[in-house]
Amino acid sequence: MRLVQLSRHNIAFPSPEGALREPNGLLALGGDLSPARLLMAYQRGIFPWFSPGDPILWWSPDPRAILEPSQFHLSRSMKRFHAKSPYRVTLNYAFGQVIEGCAADRDEGTWITHDIINAYLRLHELGYAHSIEVWDNDTLVGGMYGVAQGTLFCGESMFSRAVNASKTALLVFCQEFSLRGGQLMDCQVLNEHTASLGAVEITRRHYLDELGNLRQQKLPQNFWVPRTLFMPQV
């Protein structure tokens, strides 16, 4: 296993099975963030993640964290909160604001650079990247974004500026996604937060098999049309 240097003139990727074991899943570096290359990466179970000032790094970890939307774990406290939620949840209303919210400075810094923002804005304009917004009246208080692959959604990042805002984004999206035929969410790497919401780990091989199948399937034609997914009870 060795780290592969990508060409700027060829969007092909090496097999994810050749990724390093340490750091887990690092597959290649270089290339660019063009829409064609990003889409090729997602189709092969690969995603970019790198720190400001570093070269573009491409990953395909083993194991892979996934969440079946129908298996979202709703805690008692979250169930009580959501029953009286003050939030309105929308789809594809404010992609730029959501990715900017995810990129806002945090204690640990951010990997969402201006280049990443511009790259995913292009994917959104092309109809591949999507956002879920959580509003308190007309103020954006949370959200998430990711890339669609048929009936699989590759979650990239989320943010929260109010109590349970990001959980609300994920909960409402999972409910709608599952209801309309969505099968799987890619969470990339398991952490305490996603595990508490029902995410589990599967092998990379299993994930790639699921990806190959699910990206060929289709959601209803109008699924990604900007719309309201949830309104607070009056």
Curated annotation (Swiss-Prot):
One term under GO cellular component: cytoplasm
EC code(s) of this entry: 2.3.2.6
Pfam families: Leu_Phe_trans
Keyword Transferase: yes
Coiled coil (residue ranges): none
Catalyzed reactions: N-terminal L-lysyl-[protein] + L-leucyl-tRNA(Leu) = N-terminal L-leucyl-L-lysyl-[protein] + tRNA(Leu) + H(+); N-terminal L-arginyl-[protein] + L-leucyl-tRNA(Leu) = N-terminal L-leucyl-L-arginyl-[protein] + tRNA(Leu) + H(+); L-phenylalanyl-tRNA(Phe) + an N-terminal L-alpha-aminoacyl-[protein] = an N-terminal L-phenylalanyl-L-alpha-aminoacyl-[protein] + tRNA(Phe)
GO biological process: protein catabolic process
Record carries keyword Methyltransferase: no
Matching SUPFAM superfamilies: Acyl-CoA N-acyltransferases (Nat)
Molecular function in Gene Ontology: leucyl-tRNA--protein transferase activity
Gene3D superfamilies per UniProt: Leucyl/phenylalanyl-tRNA-protein transferase, C-terminal domain, Leucyl/phenylalanyl-tRNA-protein transferase, N-terminal domain
This protein's UniProt keywords: Acyltransferase, Cytoplasm, Transferase
Subcellular compartments: Cytoplasm
NCBIfam families, A to Z: aat
Alphabetical list of PANTHER family matching this protein: LEUCYL/PHENYLALANYL-TRNA--PROTEIN TRANSFERASE, LEUCYL_PHENYLALANYL-TRNA--PROTEIN TRANSFERASE
Function: Functions in the N-end rule pathway of protein degradation where it conjugates Leu, Phe and, less efficiently, Met from aminoacyl-tRNAs to the N-termini of proteins containing an N-terminal arginine or lysine.
Family indicated by similarity: Belongs to the L/F-transferase family.
Protein name: Leucyl/phenylalanyl-tRNA--protein transferase
Native organism: Enterobacter sp. (strain 638)
